[in-house]
Amino acid sequence: MGSEMGIRDSIKCRENDFSLNGLMGVDLYKKTAGIIGTGKIGMAMARICRGFGMRVLGYDMYPNPNNDIEYVTLDELLAQSDLISLHCPLTEQTHHLINRESIAKMKDGVILVNTSRGGLVNTEELIEGIRKGKFFAVGLDVYEEENDKVYEDLSGTILQSSTMARLLSFPNVMVTSHQGFFTREALEAISRITLENAAAFEKGETLVNEVTK
């Protein structure tokens, strides 16, 4: 939602700038949201979008017939969606799913949000689309060039990534530091589930969250 209306509003007000210049947003009501990847997180996003009165489309390589969502092809989702949100895993099939070709199939003025995996998006071709004015806004919580310093304070250093510097230069792009998981409740759940599974393993009991190949 920060990509839709702009976090810039809050920043401007903190600087005593209460003008409306550059803050024009768009309504989500009666618009179409496209959810790519309809697992638990994707379906949670679908419910949020419905709360704003949006029509919701879904695309998944392995669609779940039990999901309450209108499944369409990827091309149909790209062509019809005003908001596209990525929630699929990064695999050989989904690597650079968002690229020059798929961007060309999107509506002009589309909003793109990626909170899943950076490699889903070809960043250079995304930047190309941003420069051409294809997007109303882009929100990125993940990006291709993430490294072991992603959670460090680099405010006093020079960015080594020209790609990140270019993304940050666009007024309609919002980048966050891969913090979608960073809530008190989520961290408590991670700790509890990890300890419960470790205890079950030690006792030779069934692992509720066992990972298998």
Would you name each region that the model predicts?
Residues 109, 117-213:
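Rossmann-like dinucleotide-binding domain for NAD(H)/NADP(H)
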Residues 113:
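Glycine-rich nucleotide-phosphate-binding loops and adjacent flexible coil segments
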Residues 2, 45, 125-126:
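Aromatic/hydrophobic pocket-lining residues that form π-stacking "cages" and hydrophobic walls in ligand
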Residues 1-7:
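Short, small-residue-biased leader/transition segments that mark boundaries at the very start
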Residues 2, 52, 67, 169-170:
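Short, structured coil segments at secondary-structure junctions
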Residues 21-108:
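Rossmann-like dinucleotide/phosphate-binding beta-alpha-beta segment
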Residues 13-18, 28, 97-98, 142, ...:
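Short clusters of hydrophobic/aromatic residues that line enzyme substrate/ligand-binding pockets
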Residues 8-24, 200:
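A charged, well-structured terminal subsegment
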